[in-house]
UniProtKB/Swiss-Prot annotation:
InterPro entries: 6-hairpin_glycosidase_sf, 6hp_glycosidase-like_sf, Carb-bd_put_dom, Gal_mutarotase_sf_dom, GH36_catalytic, GH94_Enzymes, GH94N_ChBP, Glyco_hydro_65_N_sf. The active site is at 492 (proton donor). Optimum pH is 7.0-7.7. PANTHER family: CELLOBIONIC ACID PHOSPHORYLASE-RELATED, PUTATIVE-RELATED. Its EC number is 2.4.1.280. N-acetyl-alpha-D-glucosamine 1-phosphate binds at residues 333, 343, 349-350, 490, 492, 637, 644, 690, 709-710. N-acetyl-D-glucosamine binds at residues 492, 636-637. The gene is chbP. GO terms for biological process: carbohydrate metabolic process. Keywords: Carbohydrate metabolism, Glycosyltransferase, Transferase. This is N,N'-diacetylchitobiose phosphorylase. GO terms for molecular function: carbohydrate binding; glycosyltransferase activity. SUPFAM superfamilies: Galactose mutarotase-like, Six-hairpin glycosidases. It comes from Vibrio proteolyticus (Aeromonas proteolytica).
Amino acid sequence: MKYGYFDNDNREYVITRPDVPAPWTNYLGTEKFCTVISHNAGGYSFYNSPEYNRVTKFRPNATFDRPGHYVYLRDDDSGDYWSISWQPVAKSLDEAQYQIRHGLSYSKFQCDYNGIHARKTLFVPKGEDAEIWDVVIKNTSDQVRTISAFSFVEFSFSHIQSDNQNHQMSLYSAGTAYRPGLIEYDLYYNTDDFEGFYYLASTFDPDSYDGQRDRFLGLYRDEANPLAVEQGRCSNSAQTCYNHCGSLHKQFTLQPGEEIRFAYILGIGKGNGERLREHYQDVANIDAAFAAIKAHWDERCAKFQVKSPNQGLDTMINAWTLYQAETCVVWSRFASFIEVGGRTGLGYRDTAQDAISVPHANPEMTRKRIVDLLRGQVKAGYGLHLFDPDWFDPEKEDVAPSKSPTVVPTPSDEDKIHGIKDTCSDDHLWLIPTICKYVMETGETSFFDQMIPYADGGEASVYEHMKAALDFSAEYVGQTGICKGLRADWNDCLNLGGGESSMVSFLHFWALQEFIDLAKFLGKDQDVNTYTEMAANVREACETHLWDDEGGWYIRGLTKNGDKIGTAQQQEGRVHLESNTLAVLSGLASQERGEQAMDAVDEHLFSPYGLHLNAPSFSTPNDDIGFVTRVYQGVKENGAIFSHPNPWAWVAETKLGRGDRAMKFYDALNPYNQNDIIEKRIAEPYSYVQFIMGRDHQDHGRANHPWLTGTSGWAYFAVTNYILGVQSGFTGLSVDPCIPSDWPGFEVTRQWRGATYHIQVENPDHVSKGVKSITLNGAPIQGRIPPQAQGSDNQVVVVLG
């Protein structure tokens, strides 16, 4: 069953049936103000932090997709009313027609009902801390119509804990007031004129308004049947205390064929509502702001465009996967309909991996995130697993947060720095390839010399920070020489404690290879020798202790008692995705062992929906292995199709030269390919999800937790750099694809260091891998394509064979 389709010309997903089996969401905002919005206009807004600066309320996991950012319409002649989005009024789909278009940082809602055509476009203008609701109402009947429009948002008390729990204070610490054309919401305890005020404004002069939620909705009612809309007029309520909303009402008389256009503006900051209300009364300014959002993403998407025989790959890579990856870089794991805003801060490993995918499209944000992570590293070399970057930003050290009487105090400086017992063994290592990729993309080699403080005092160059990360992993090894698992590795539920993690040793080896290449480029011969020797020791330990001869794969690790995890002798958790894919991705495994390991992955872990994380799933609790054994079978880390490491398998297969297998794995996970089986998938077909129920669960194939997952960044990185094979380097651009053998070729347009490269890949011999020749602007070249002049257009032809 399908509910919509991809409109690639407009980079939109079009939902033709609003009764999808779950909220399908989108992200509005590219800077500080963000709205998470569903296809039915449910969702919430926040400024910078959904934990501390929530603008509108959200009730997570509610039976219905409520509340939201709604516009109600009422036929004042008949008393009939509906909403432009299907919810919350939910008119019969036999009587009303709805269409929703999720675009890149905007969403469009359209409704045709009883001779009235209505559209609502939601977006956050660049440079503003506000959300625009651009509304058009048209009379398509042959009669004069009198139509009233009502807005509705429910304001939040700002801090999630107070908003959701401490009502004995929050109900009495805020109030609404009416100003000409707007409802102003005052967080009275907060003396800051910016963060202490929210508003909802309109470009029209309202006929009535409500600032009190319960006056607008009425007693024993909800958003589906608000009293004010039913009666055709708000009660002009505004006062201190209790629950607050923003509803502005206006009646319009429309001749046949006539349309009216106006806007609502939801935002933050005292006085900003008046300013933006006046500004957007000129609809040309609305059009210009929307055009700027379109241009923002046109510019980013243009950095890498592909035309291949695989339409699903083209659709996702040319827009949606980059969009999701950058959403994760900007908003981390802050806010979705699953992560509902109670955790402000950066997950160390999450952010380091997210950032590797977008240095070409957003180098400024990539650099910022890398600096954030380096400031969150301690002198010993490990990273703080979860931290607020503001803690260590020298420009924000003296900025005291507004103190609410209803919140838990912020942690002391000592509490911000955790010790070894709370350290995840993989966090810091992801930094190495990400920093290298950033410099390869931008050419900013001086970045390695920039001095950046450690979280626990002192400072060092970026290059020395990288060495500290590598040295930490070399020091914290077990008796076999394999890296200790510490609190956990990438798999948070694999709590090895004093045990050892094969995944981290493979990751350590990959980071070492990247660093050795960097040291060679910088001419640091002593470091080349030191870390080459370190890498050799890692390889020897891994090949000696981690290969399972009977199974023909790499084990997952060892418990603190020395018992192996992931052997052919075991009944549960025999084969694991992370260890086998990273053994190959890192370059540690030989061709022979790599092929055996990935054959085992294909045999034991593959499904039509992607690769399982492990199999068979654990059914018996074993605390030596960790919490993973106490997760339901086929769910999350225990035998689900955990999406994030799936792209590691795509990369691994390209390293082995097996393009057909790489594409088989890619196609299985690609949400585009599940667009017509939504009754199985449930989640959005334009977004990767955290996990898909595994074969040991009754809902096998159901996708869970869309948007905020490192899968998107890794999917983009794996396809662009390894399957399509277009990689930036310190000295040039390389093109070395690994594609399905039946592809005749493909085209890529790639912008790199200010020049554009139009790359034509030809595959006359139908091979998967192997470059026979490269020409640059008609001249044969060997190896990498050197940087060309800024602003130049260059023709590259690559022949495989």
